[in-house]
Amino acid sequence: MKQVLLGGIHFYQKVISPMKPATCRFYPTCSHYGKEAIEKHGALRGGYLTTRRLLRCQPFHPGGLDFVPETFDWKAPLQRENPAEHQK
């Protein structure tokens, strides 16, 4: 399952993304975030983190720095209160 998800992200990055203008509100981009999340936390947890990230990547969210967490917690809030926490 992990390889299927990573293959989908790779396809998006190489085929679809170059045809679109850059619109991601975050750094790293959502596709890079998804790739790292799945590699670091596996298909289920990484897929969950990626889905949460994609739901936040919309015009009503300010975006900013949002790195894949080192540890995974199902109960973690959907968004950290202080994006500067990522810069530590």
Swiss-Prot record:
Could be involved in insertion of integral membrane proteins into the membrane. It is a peripheral membrane protein. The keyword ATP-binding does not apply. Transmembrane segments: none annotated. This is Putative membrane protein insertion efficiency factor. GO terms for cellular component: plasma membrane. It comes from the Bacteria. It holds the Pfam family YidD. It is found in: Cell membrane. Belongs to the UPF0161 family. It comes from Exiguobacterium sibiricum (strain DSM 17290 / CCUG 55495 / CIP 109462 / JCM 13490 / 255-15). Keywords: Cell membrane, Membrane. InterPro entries: Membr_insert_effic_factor_YidD (IPR002696). NCBIfam families: membrane protein insertion efficiency factor YidD.
